């Protein structure tokens, strides 16, 4: 992979669906649009993931909402990073979401959400903060 910093604000993909400028950015400069992807819906993979770490308490939580075309995956993990490391993860899979989760096109703002009878999870990205909410019934029972 090239070590190239992308600094110009531009669309992520060209008209043919290929990357306009491969590389990395220090800020969000590449603009994503699901409509620009030239692949079948079942091959489009979108996700939102957060890892929240408390160094003071040696614990962490990881939260994922993903729409991977042919499969959806929602998971929550609790990690104890202390003297006796331990983790527990619960995952819900769904067949063929194919864009129905309507994940935001930008990490700057928007709401990512998933809800069913066992899990209510949403990530709210606002102007000055992000709110991560997770109500996972019977988590680790």
Map each language-model feature to its residues.
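Targeting-peptide/extracellular-domain and disordered-appendage signature
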Residues: 1-141
């Amino acid at each position: 992979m090239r070590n190239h910093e992308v600094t110009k604000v531009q669309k992520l993909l060209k008209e043919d669906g290929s990357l306009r400028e491969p590389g990395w950015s220090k800020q969000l400069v590449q603009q994503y649009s699901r409509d620009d992807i030239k692949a079948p819906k079942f091959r489009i993979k979108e996700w939102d993931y957060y890892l929240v770490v408390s160094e003071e308490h040696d614990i962490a939580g990881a939260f994922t909402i993903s729409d991977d075309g042919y499969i959806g995956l929602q998971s929550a993990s609790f990690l104890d990073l202390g003297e006796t490391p331990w983790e527990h993860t619960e995952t819900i899979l769904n067949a063929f979401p194919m864009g129905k989760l309507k994940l935001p096109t930008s990490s700057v703002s928007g709401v990512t959400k998933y809800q069913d009878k066992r899990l209510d999870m949403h990530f709210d990205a606002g102007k000055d903060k992000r709110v991560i909410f997770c109500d996972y019934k019977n988590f680790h029972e």
